[in-house]
Amino acid sequence: MVAVEHAEPIAKKARQIIKKNKLSHKITVYVGNIESESLNDKLISRFQDEFQECQSLKVFDIVMSEWMGYALFFENMLPSVIHARNNFLKRDGLILPDFASLYMVVLLKCWI
């Protein structure tokens, strides 16, 4: 399992929790952006066998992301999720969450 976190303090805390739960051998936390070339190099190194087999980094079964900000789009993380899908997700992989609903209402202020 791989986690990619942009904020160093959050990544550090995640590593502490992972270590405390004795899962360091299963979960690796990287600091950075999913789109960065240096992350691609780290993933190729980490998943060398899978990369050699299919010559692709599309080795992940699930991409899980907290991509929605308030009003769904404020943090603009959707392009990062799309990048992860296009570059790392297996053909039959899942993106979680995989849907969202946005409800809108028109309000008018009328003076009488």
Describe every region a protein language model picked out:
Residues M1-I112:
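Class I SAM-binding transferase module
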